[in-house]
């Protein structure tokens, strides 16, 4: 055994050993499935990856040592726009670019010592994977959950192509051509996630081991609203204008209606003299993003259509407007304007001089007209015809009941959640396995013809239709149903489809006959521990839950939720240098520090140094492999686990990285001194042995408990404390010391696997430390013979003394009164009461 810790000698040797050893299943043991959200193969790991993957690696190694049959797989979320952009910019095929990146990142993961079941590795861009993605899509089709309808896309009028949202800048221009982007309708594919809205909402209550924050975010995204759908008649439109409202008790206060600019009624009902203004406004709104339109920080804009509808409750005419803040995809695409009792409506009505009516009086009767602000609370109905005097909740019920009787509306539950648009006008994605036949209509590709493979000979220009839409030879096929000439679907699927079921494929990754066997998923699923960023709290996690429920209903799964426990790790931050005036960021090598202030070189521009999320654009990223090359993989892993609790932000610190490297060196020294006999074997007493053994078993108790509770930082702190206790211990060969050496190596192994394996071998042990048993806790070793007792007199601390741990209350009182510091406050006074907090303090109440 070398005298000094040298990770550069240890780590390659251990990694080679692990790579050559088969990944053995441990049948007959309870299962544990640990999973980190699989990465997009960008080609380079960042510290956020290292933090995420270190967490599940610790958990999986720990669980294996605790006797579990562990599944800890990895794969690649490999479809997506960056590969297609690389094809355009660099002339390299997306498949080649992706494969190169996967190979590079696979090597990086191995160099960091992560214990993955590499034999289960998947890549979503592989036909062997997306064959089954297509098969599952067809399950949705058979269930009536996949359909086509017109949807709005971003259209680049110069390049004549559809753009993803991320390809449109803040000014609404194309990232490539610079043209102002237009909104255009296009037939696209959707999945009916709204059919599962209520179950997705209610089942959040069963996810007790998910962060509350994530559950609330999903609840808000689903956005359940209970209210009514009411119909306002309008000439020439048999169905009238349908609106949804959560406040039917305010219907007598409606002074206008607002349609979304995209609403199909707009063109039909607009008065001739208003058409030019309305069309101009619609065109203007189409260039705005949804986020801009609903932003609370910008003024609401609208224009009158010149049309008039009828409020059936009052018999009064109400003008019909269109406004940017109403979205066609939400509700009915129309809202009723009640400015007296809605803040947004109040602002809009004030801006356009529309009437404002009071129809809900405050309980104290304090409101008078004209209203100076919207009253949005519940109250008592006024100016509401036969419903006057009812409180708001009762008024809601009675008005909905009356509307149903009159045929003017009905009670309704609405969700903010919209059906999932999965069509992408892209090449590098999973082809949608559908064919369009002039005789049969939309026809699914039969199972035996799957996968519908992506053609390899494709031209990428970034202009015109999707590359697939240009390949007539690929598009033209025979109809699977009647044999007539037909055409393939040229859209590919949203990449969230791929990641909505990958955790199921890992259970049976080499199955060539089906996406997964029922036996495999029944054994491994649900995932016991899932780890990933909070940015996936809504879409990925919600879509995965949706997929699980649909596949359950199709008879493919037997469980309701995919992930039992969820941990969302915090971001990794590092110092970034920015010019506050221009918001320009500077690389560290262009920054100099003078007197605690920072300046740009060479012009001396004053800069601000702040901790920000690591990013290439901010020049503050830390390459994990740079840290590994200097300090080793174990140090990098230990740092990201120790620096902060996993759910909190982690601030990078070079000094703390060095601190973890030094700690590993000290543990190495502890084991070396034991193995070599360099530490003197001085005689020790039984009490000293008991004290050290207590420290050893405290560490066993704390490290195991802390891993279970994600407290990796305090677990590592407990290891540091134990190593310090052993370094200070006089005997280097006593039974307690020997036990401590073996224990600290085992406890360290899940966190720092390379040094753990090396030290295990140095101790003369055969086999892999990570398949050995976790140290057994001896509860009796934790019992203390003496404790430090705080003594209070009338609630104020007067002394602390060592007392036998098993002393009775009477004995504690005697010992307390024997203290000279205590007697100064009790002599000559009567003891009225004695309060004992076992193991902590005694309080003497005197008077």
Swiss-Prot record:
Keywords, A to Z? Aminoacyl-tRNA synthetase, ATP-binding, Cytoplasm, Ligase, Nucleotide-binding, Protein biosynthesis
Query: Is Secreted among the key words of this record?
Result: no
Record EC number: 6.1.1.4
Coiled-coil features, chain-numbered ranges: none
Q: Which reaction does it catalyse?
A: tRNA(Leu) + L-leucine + ATP = L-leucyl-tRNA(Leu) + AMP + diphosphate
Family, according to the entry, reads as follows:
Belongs to the class-I aminoacyl-tRNA synthetase family.
What is the name of the protein in this document? Answer: Leucine--tRNA ligase
**Molecular function as annotated in GO:** aminoacyl-tRNA deacylase activity; ATP binding; leucine-tRNA ligase activity
Asked whether the keyword Cytoplasm is assigned, the reply is yes
Gene for this chain = leuS
Native source organism of the sequence: Gloeobacter violaceus (strain ATCC 29082 / PCC 7421)
Q: Which Pfam families match?
A: Anticodon_1 (PF08264), tRNA-synt_1 (PF00133), tRNA-synt_1_2 (PF13603), tRNA-synt_1g (PF09334)
User: Quick one: a GO biological-process term for this protein?
Assistant: leucyl-tRNA aminoacylation
Q: Name one GO cellular component term.
A: cytosol
| Entry's localization field | Cytoplasm
Chief place where the protein resides: cytoplasm
- Chain ranges for the short sequence motif 'KMSKS' region as given in the UniProt record: 613-617
Q: Where is this motif: 'HIGH' region?
A: 39-49
Q: Entry's PANTHER family?
A: LEUCINE--TRNA LIGASE, MITOCHONDRIAL (PTHR43740:SF2), LEUCYL-TRNA SYNTHETASE (PTHR43740)
Residues annotated to bind ATP: 616
């Amino acid at each position: 055994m070398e005298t000094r810790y040298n990770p550069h000698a240890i780590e390659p040797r251990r990694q080679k050993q692990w790579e050559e050893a088969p990944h053995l299943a441990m049948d007959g043991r309870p299962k544990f499935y640990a999973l980190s959200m699989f990465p997009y193969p960008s080609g380079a790991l960042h510290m956020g990856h290292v933090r995420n993957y270190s967490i599940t690696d610790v958990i999986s190694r720990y669980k294996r040592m605790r006797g579990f049959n562990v599944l800890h797989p990895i794969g690649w979320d490999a479809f997506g726009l960056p590969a297609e952009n690389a094809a355009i910019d660099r002339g390299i095929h997306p498949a080649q670019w992706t494969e190169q990146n996967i190979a590079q990142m696979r090597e990086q993961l191995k160099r960091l010592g992560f214990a993955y079941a590499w034999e289960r590795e998947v890549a979503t861009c592989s036909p062997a994977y997306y064959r089954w993605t297509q098969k599952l899509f067809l399950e949705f089709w058979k269930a009536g959950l996949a359909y086509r309808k017109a949807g709005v896309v971003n259209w680049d009028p110069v390049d004549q192509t559809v753009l993803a949202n991320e390809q449109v800048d803040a000014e609404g221009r194309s990232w490539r051509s610079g043209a102002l982007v237009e909104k255009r309708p296009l037939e696209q594919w959707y999945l009916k996630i709204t059919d599962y809205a209520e179950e997705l909402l209610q089942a959040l209550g069963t996810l007790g081991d998910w962060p509350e924050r994530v559950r609330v975010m999903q609840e808000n995204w689903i956005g359940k609203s209970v209210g009514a759908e009411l119909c306002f008649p309008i000439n020439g439109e048999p169905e009238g204008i349908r609106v949804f409202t959560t406040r039917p008790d305010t219907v007598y206060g409606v002074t206008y209606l607002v349609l979304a600019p995209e609403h199909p009624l707009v063109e039909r009902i607009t008065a001739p003299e208003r058409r030019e203004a309305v069309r101009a406004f619609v065109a203007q709104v189409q260039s705005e993003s949804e986020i801009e339109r609903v932003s609370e920080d910008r003024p609401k804009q609208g224009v009158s259509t010149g049309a008039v509808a009828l409020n059936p409750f009052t018999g009064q005419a109400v003008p019909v407007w269109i406004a940017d803040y109403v979205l066609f995809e939400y509700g009915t695409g129309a809202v009723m304007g009640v400015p007296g009792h809605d803040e947004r409506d109040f602002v809009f009505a004030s801006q356009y001089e529309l009437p404002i009516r009071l129809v809900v009086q405050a309980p104290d009767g304090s409101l008078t007209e004209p209203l100076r602000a919207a009253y949005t609370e519940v109250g008592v109905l006024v100016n509401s015809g036969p419903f006057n005097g009812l409180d708001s909740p009762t008024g809601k019920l009675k008005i909905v009941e009356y509307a149903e009787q009159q045929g003017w509306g009905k009670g309704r539950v609405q969700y903010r959640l919209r059906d999932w648009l999965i069509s992408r006008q892209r090449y590098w994605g999973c082809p949608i396995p559908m064919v369009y036949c002039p005789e049969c209509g939309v026809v699914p590709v039969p199972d035996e013809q799957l996968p519908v493979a992506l053609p390899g000979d494709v031209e990428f220009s970034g202009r015109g239709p999707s590359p697939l839409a240009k390949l007539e030879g690929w598009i033209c096929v025979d109809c699977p149903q009647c044999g007539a000439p037909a055409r393939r679907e040229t859209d590919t699927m949203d990449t969230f489809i791929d990641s909505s079921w990958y955790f199921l494929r890992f259970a049976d990754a080499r199955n060539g006959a089906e996406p997964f066997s029922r036996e495999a998923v029944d054994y491994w699923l649900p995932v016991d521990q899932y780890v990933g960023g909070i940015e996936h709290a809504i879409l990925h996690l919600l879509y995965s839950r949706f997929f699980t429920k649909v596949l359950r209903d199709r008879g493919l799964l037997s469980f309701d939720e995919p992930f039992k426990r969820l941990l969302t790790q915090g971001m990794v931050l590092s110092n970034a240098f920015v010019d506050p005036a221009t918001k320009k960021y500077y690389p560290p090598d262009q920054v100099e520090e003078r007197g605690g202030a920072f300046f740009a070189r060479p012009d001396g521009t004053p800069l601000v140094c702040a901790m920000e999320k690591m990013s290439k654009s901010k020049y503050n990223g830390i390459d994990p492999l740079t840290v590994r090359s200097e300090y080793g993989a174990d140090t990098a892993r230990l740092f990201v686990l120790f620096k902060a609790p996993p759910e909190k932000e982690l601030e990078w610190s070079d000094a703390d990285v060095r601190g973890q490297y030094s700690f590993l060196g000290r543990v190495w020294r502890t084991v070396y001194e034991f193995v070599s006999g360099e530490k003197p074997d001085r005689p020790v007493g039984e009490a000293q042995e008991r004290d050290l053994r207590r420290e050893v078993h405290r560490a066993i108790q704390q490290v195991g408990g802390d891993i279970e509770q994600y407290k990796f930082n305090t677990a590592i702190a407990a290891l540091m404390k134990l190593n310090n206790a052993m370094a200070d211990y006089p005997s280097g060969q006593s039974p307690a010391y020997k036990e401590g050496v073996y224990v600290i190596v085992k406890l360290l192994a899940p966190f720092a696997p390379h040094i753990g394996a090396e030290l295990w071998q140095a101790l003369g042990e055969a086999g892999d430390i990570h398949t050995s048993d976790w140290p057994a806790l001896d509860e009796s070793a934790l019992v203390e013979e003496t404790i430090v007792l705080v003594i209070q007199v009338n609630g104020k601390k007067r002394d602390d003394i060592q007392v036998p741990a098993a002393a009775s209350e009477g004995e504690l009182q005697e010992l307390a009164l024997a203290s000279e510091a205590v007697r100064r406050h009790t002599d000559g006074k009567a003891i009225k009461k004695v309060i004992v907090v076992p193991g902590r303090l005694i309080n003497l109440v005197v008077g």
